[in-house]
Amino acid sequence: MTASAYLDLLDELLRPGIAGLSAPLVDAQVRFVAGCQRPDGGFGGRQGGSDPYYTDFALRVLTWLAPAHEAFSRTAAYLAGRSLPPRDVVECFSLLSTRRLLERQRVGQDKGTVPFSASPAETTDENWDSPQAVLPGQLGFRTLATLSAPALDPLRLTEWLYGRLLPSGGFARTADDPRVSAYHTFLGALCFQMLGVEMPAVEDAVRAVQALRRPDGGYAELAGQSASQTNATAAALGFLTMHDGMLAENMAPAARFFAQMQSADGGLKPHAAVRGGDLLSTFTGLLTLWGLDARQQIDAAAVARFLRGAAHPGGGFLACDADDAADVEYTYYGVGTLALLRLWSTAP
């Protein structure tokens, strides 16, 4: 499976749920995300200027909800002005993912369509406790103005990635930390595949990530850590599935781990020591449970209630109801979780 295939399959999975979002909800999210664009065309977080990380998340949301938005052309100019090399594997992924989204818009324009678009349904968003009530609808397409995705030197990025690989396989979080990271290895693998280059020493990386598995069925983020983490587990399983390294006997324990992470507020916790859920953990956990065919492990109605509490009245999503500000990253997780809940409600 290529990274483009992996990311395209993710979009295809979420497409039916995205397509049924109500017009007021779509408009609120688009206004919020577009309002986070900086004068240079990039997007920022809660503080500071443009950052490739937040720019990627913003374009993902707009690709879902408003693929003809003028923000795309402004972002193309921002990305064209970025200098290489990236700061870390996360930024490398963000740059390549942003370029991929801009290229999708260009291809869609050439065909007279856009590759992904929400077609708002005539529904209200009052009853989020019922996932099926939130997300009925169907897909539509729109015409898109001409866009050009800026070029990123694939040779330079490939050489940069080679230089960040650990001798034991996979990627670390920083150059100063020799331990393999589940999250960075997953993103690094996606980077190689978006570049059309085979990841070196995949077998070593698979063994290194497999070694992060813990007795409760989850995975730690780093070697030497004793506690499993929701997002590390999702990243590890994503990487292992891509490279045929997921052992069948480990699937059910992983599903049980995610189920144990559902908190009293309905969201999934980042790890067992935290009391409440957050949208990042909720989205990645639900997405992975879907891939494990273990939907029955989670109370979807409780997730819907958690999601309603994380929705900001003016658009955007918070990390959880105790958060005080929305941002484009958590808006991506919020919209994605809405789409997953639609899948939950319609699956046989």
Question: What name fits each language-model region?
Answer:
Residues T2-S22, R46-H69, L84-Q109, W128-R156, ...:
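An alpha-helical repeat/solenoid feature that recognizes helix-turn-helix modules
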Residues L25-G41, E70-R87, R106-S130, A151-F171, ...:
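Long, well-ordered core segments of solenoidal/helical folds
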